């Protein structure tokens, strides 16, 4: 389990324990945070689970792959710390990480 912090679009902070083996997307949806649409269900084909990752944790994440990079390129809100939450597996190294849900495109 890892402590995860999620900032929603209205600035609300949600803190909770996320099970190892889940993705950040799955953990957020299990908390009932509905604004993370994740329309494709985690297949890396829609970019509706776009989040901004806390800078200190970027090096602890798996490398950005081609499909994810291409989908993020389609966002008007892409930043250097943009990732798709469906591509971020939860593990102890992510304990304390904050992600912010990106604005809708």
From Swiss-Prot:
Q: How does activity depend on pH?
A: Optimum pH is 6.0.
Going by the UniProt record, its keywords in alphabetical order are: 2Fe-2S, Electron transport, Iron, Iron-sulfur, Metal-binding, Monooxygenase, NAD, Oxidoreductase, Transport
Entry note: thermal dependence? Optimum temperature is 25-30 degrees Celsius.
**Knockout consequences:** Disruption mutant shows growth defect on DDVA.
What does the record list as GO biological process? P450-containing electron transport chain
Any Pfam family hit: Fer2
Q: Does the keyword Metal-binding apply?
A: yes
Q: Which reactions fall under this protein's catalytic activity?
A: 5,5'-dehydrodivanillate + NADH + O2 + H(+) = 2,2',3-trihydroxy-3'-methoxy-5,5'-dicarboxybiphenyl + formaldehyde + NAD(+) + H2O
In terms of CDD domains, this protein maps to:
fer2
Entry's cofactor comment = Binds 1 [2Fe-2S] cluster.
EC numbers: 1.14.13.-
Q: Which Gene3D superfamilies match?
A: 3.10.20.30
All copies of the 2Fe-2S ferredoxin-type domain together span: 2-105
Q: Which cofactor does it need?
A: [2Fe-2S] cluster
GO MF term list? 2 iron, 2 sulfur cluster binding; electron transfer activity; metal ion binding; monooxygenase activity
Q: Identify the InterPro entries for this entry.
A: 2Fe-2S_ferredoxin-like_sf, 2Fe-2S_ferredoxin-type, Adrenodoxin-like, Beta-grasp_dom_sf
**SUBUNIT field:** Monomer. The three-component monooxygenase is composed of an oxygenase (LigXa), a ferredoxin (LigXc) and a ferredoxin reductase (LigXd).
Cited function: Involved in the catabolism of 5,5'-dehydrodivanillate (DDVA), an intermediate in the biodegradation of lignin. Part of a three-component monooxygenase that catalyzes the O-demethylation of DDVA, leading to the formation of 2,2',3-trihydroxy-3'-methoxy-5,5'-dicarboxybiphenyl (OH-DDVA). LigXc probably functions as an intermediate electron transfer protein between LigXd and LigXa.
Question: What family is reported?
Answer: Belongs to the adrenodoxin/putidaredoxin family.
What this protein is called in its record is 5,5'-dehydrodivanillate O-demethylase ferredoxin subunit
Q: What is the organism of origin for this protein?
A: Sphingobium sp. (strain NBRC 103272 / SYK-6)
Gene behind this protein: ligXc
